[in-house]
């Protein structure tokens, strides 16, 4: 296991693939979608995905030293599309880390949704950059 200098584990040795049933993964994504849509009526499309990885690493050196590490990884990605006056813009958010799916609490989902919706709204309000020759 990856350990800090004081000997404590850097992250839990959990299998994120088995930490949440498929139906619960779908429910988590649906909660995220509802949060994003509720933040602004201009949000017309929400796309979210979950990804996880579980690696078990074993190293055997030629001097006989053995080492192992269990590395869980989860990631949630969110993209929203907002529309105003026929113009569409997108925003994205998300995150993750070496945890299981319990990391994605309602507060974390709210943060990701806020990030993506805010980015889309800023893009909707953006004006084109001035064009022309530079002097």
Residue ranges and their predicted role:
Residues 1-135:
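Active-site bordering "gate/hinge" segments
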């Amino acid at each position: 296991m990856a350990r800090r200098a004081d000997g404590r584990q850097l992250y839990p040795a959990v299998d994120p693939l088995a930490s949440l049933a498929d139906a619960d993964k779908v429910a988590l994504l649906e909660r995220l979608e509802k949060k994003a849509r509720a933040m602004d009526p201009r949000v017309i499309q929400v796309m979210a995905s979950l990804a996880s990885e579980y690696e078990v690493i074993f190293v055997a050196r030629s001097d006989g030293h053995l080492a192992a590490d269990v590395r869980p990884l989860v990631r949630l990605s969110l993209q929203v599309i907002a529309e105003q006056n026929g113009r569409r813009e997108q925003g994205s958010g998300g995150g993750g880390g070496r945890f299981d799916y319990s990391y994605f609490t309602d507060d974390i989902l709210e943060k990701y949704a806020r990030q993506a919706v805010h980015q889309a709204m800023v893009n909707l309000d953006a004006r084109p950059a001035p064009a022309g020759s530079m002097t």
